[in-house]
């Protein structure tokens, strides 16, 4: 499945919630009718079946993290093999992706921009360039912006925007050095309550 390249607000309207696909600190519902689906008949929301509800939740989480369907299913399979709660394992696997960690540290204004920074070899992990967005970051890893990329205006702008948001407790960032430490894998209580990962588990368990 190809990556979606259309309007970001349309995806958020389809899921009925802010997917944080746009940069900035202002929630997009102030300029976008999230309660109305896109399209001519968007105001007429169909009643979803149990399967439809589960599918929508899966699509929502997949779009938040910018992961393709095949990748997402593979993450679920890995989460199911791990000990503990499968849904929580799934979210943690998505959270330790390098592109997501770059976003959490504030080096990219969106996950899509952070993924681009990684792909363009602007990011280092423990002093080595890593250009794989799905690279799994471990506790105590140091993520930094490559020296020749530190003058990029978009990175400086992203850090300014990130400074207006509450910084995640599981990362520690030195803006001046453009360097951050991934202190630990976030627990479920650290992450958004707007996600119902159990619906995804139920969907894939069928």
Curated annotation (Swiss-Prot):
Gene3D superfamilies: Ribosomal Protein S4 Delta 41, Chain A, domain 1, RNA-binding S4 domain. Keywords: Ribonucleoprotein, Ribosomal protein, RNA-binding, rRNA-binding. It comes from Shewanella frigidimarina (strain NCIMB 400). GO terms for biological process: ribosomal small subunit biogenesis; translation. PANTHER family: 30S 40S RIBOSOMAL PROTEIN, SMALL RIBOSOMAL SUBUNIT PROTEIN US4M. Belongs to the universal ribosomal protein uS4 family. This is Small ribosomal subunit protein uS4. Signal peptide: none annotated. HAMAP family: Ribosomal_uS4_B. One of its GO terms (molecular function) is rRNA binding. SUPFAM superfamilies: Alpha-L RNA-binding motif (SSF55174). NCBIfam families: PRK05327.1 (NF003717), rpsD_bact (TIGR01017). Part of the 30S ribosomal subunit. Contacts protein S5. The interaction surface between S4 and S5 is involved in control of translational fidelity. GO terms for cellular component: small ribosomal subunit. Residues 96-156 form the S4 RNA-binding domain. CDD domains: S4. One of the primary rRNA binding proteins, it binds directly to 16S rRNA where it nucleates assembly of the body of the 30S subunit. With S5 and S12 plays an important role in translational accuracy. PROSITE patterns: RIBOSOMAL_S4 (PS00632), S4 (PS50889).
């Amino acid at each position: 499945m190809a990556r979606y390249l259309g309007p970001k607000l349309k995806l958020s309207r389809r899921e009925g919630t802010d997917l944080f696909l746009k940069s900035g600190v202002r929630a997009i519902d102030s300029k976008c009718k999230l309660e109305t689906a896109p399209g001519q008949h968007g105001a007429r929301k169909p009643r979803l079946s149990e399967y439809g509800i589960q599918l929508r939740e899966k699509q929502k989480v997949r779009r938040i993290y910018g992961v393709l369907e095949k990748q997402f299913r593979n993450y679920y399979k890995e989460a199911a093999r791990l000990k503990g709660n499968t849904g929580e394992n799934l979210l943690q696997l998505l959270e330790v992706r390098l592109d997501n960690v770059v976003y959490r540290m504030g080096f990219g204004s969106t996950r899509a921009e952070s993924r681009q920074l990684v792909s363009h070899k602007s990011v280092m992990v423990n002093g080595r360039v890593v250009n794989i967005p799905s690279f799994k970051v471990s506790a105590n890893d140091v993520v930094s912006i490559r020296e020749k990329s530190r003058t990029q205006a978009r990175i400086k702008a992203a850090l300014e925007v990130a400074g207006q948001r509450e910084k995640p407790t599981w990362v520690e960032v030195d803006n001046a050095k453009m360097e951050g430490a991934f202190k630990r894998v976030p627990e479920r209580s650290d992450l958004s309550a707007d996600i119902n990962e159990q619906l995804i588990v139920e969907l894939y368990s069928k």
